[in-house]
């Protein structure tokens, strides 16, 4: 929070084409190592900083490398949200197998830092030039969205979007609770590793085919709100659940940390509507 002003100036100022700035932010959803429990999603949005949310230790390096590439391409600072459980864990990573795996795109020369732009020009450049370039990148990024169970037209009834780390628990729950891990079921499951700006094009199949979409994210709703906005604009006739079900009944807490138990309880408490798993 205390760094917000400096980060806002850096992001609206822009970065150099051979520079790049990645901001690693440590989130402590339970206050394990902090005086307060908190989330950084709304801060990134307020600053206009796109960000990745690695699910585990192994994803930090590839997403970090892509974050630098995206920063150079778009002129934006790019965030890397790392929650305390990921920061406190360890993993063996084979560095020899790490290869850059991100879009190869020619940058717009107008996105990069210039000298002495007035405040209004810096703000408009961020929103009219840089962030649209980020959206173009997201549409082609393999790290931004990972599909575990694909959408099947005419069959998929429930689409699940897991945001960041919680996708690990969702995948475990599906393997445990559903036959064949849900592969032959009516469920589609996507892990979202870039909560903002939302890679809308990568989610279009799910949002147009599924009868109901369930967004599972920790803390206050953030991705769910973005998807609701898309559905209103596109006039999508589907049910949307997340912190509450379509009838307004509570499903997931807006505080603390989600667990495998939370996900399994969702399976035993289905939507009161006609969506079947």
Where are these regions (language model features)?
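Thiamine diphosphate
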Residues: 1-72, 83
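Short acidic, glycine/serine/threonine-rich loops at helix termini
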Residues: 2-6, 31-38, 63-66, 72, ...
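Short coil/turn connectors at secondary-structure junctions
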Residues: 15-21, 46-49, 73-77, 154-158, ...
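Short beta-strand segments
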Residues: 22-26, 79-85, 161, 216-217
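Conformationally flexible catalytic loops at phosphate/diphosphate-handling active centers
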Residues: 74-151
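Terminal amphipathic helices with adjacent charged low-complexity linkers/tails
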Residues: 81-116, 204-266
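Glycine-rich, anion-gripping cofactor-binding loops and their flanking helix/strand elements
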Residues: 146-162, 167-233
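Conserved small/polar residues in nucleotide/adenosyl-binding loops
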Residues: 267-274
């Amino acid at each position: 929070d205390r760094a917000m002003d400096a980060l806002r100036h850096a992001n609206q100022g822009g970065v150099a084409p051979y520079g790049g700035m990645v901001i690693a932010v440590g989130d402590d959803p339970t206050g394990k190592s902090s005086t307060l429990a908190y989330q950084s999603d709304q801060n990134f949005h307020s600053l206009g900083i796109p960000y990745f949310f690695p699910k585990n230790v192994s994803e930090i390096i590839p997403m970090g490398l892509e974050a630098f590439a995206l920063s150079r391409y778009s002129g934006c600072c790019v965030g890397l949200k790392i929650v305390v459980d990921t920061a406190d864990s360890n993993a063996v990573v084979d560095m020899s197998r790490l290869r850059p795996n991100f879009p190869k795109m020619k940058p717009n020369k107008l996105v990069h830092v210039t000298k002495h732009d007035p405040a209004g020009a810096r703000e408009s450049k961020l929103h009219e030039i840089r962030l649209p370039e980020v959206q173009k990148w997201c549409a082609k990024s393999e790290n931004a969205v990972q599909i575990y169970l694909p959408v099947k037209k005419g069959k998929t009834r429930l689409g699940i979007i897991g945001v960041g780390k919680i996708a690990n628990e969702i995948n475990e729950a599906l393997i445990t609770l559903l036959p064949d891990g849900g592969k032959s079921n009516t469920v589609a499951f996507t892990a979202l590793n870039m909560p903002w700006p939302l890679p809308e094009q990568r989610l279009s199949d799910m949002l147009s085919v599924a009868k109901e979409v369930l967004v599972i994210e920790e803390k206050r709703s953030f991705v769910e709100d973005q998807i609701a906005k898309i559905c209103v604009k596109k006039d999508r006739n589907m049910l949307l659940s997340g912190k509450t079900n379509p009838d307004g009944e509570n499903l997931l807490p807006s505080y603390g940390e989600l667990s495998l138990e939370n996900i399994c309880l969702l399976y035993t408490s289905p939507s009161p509507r006609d969506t079947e798993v």
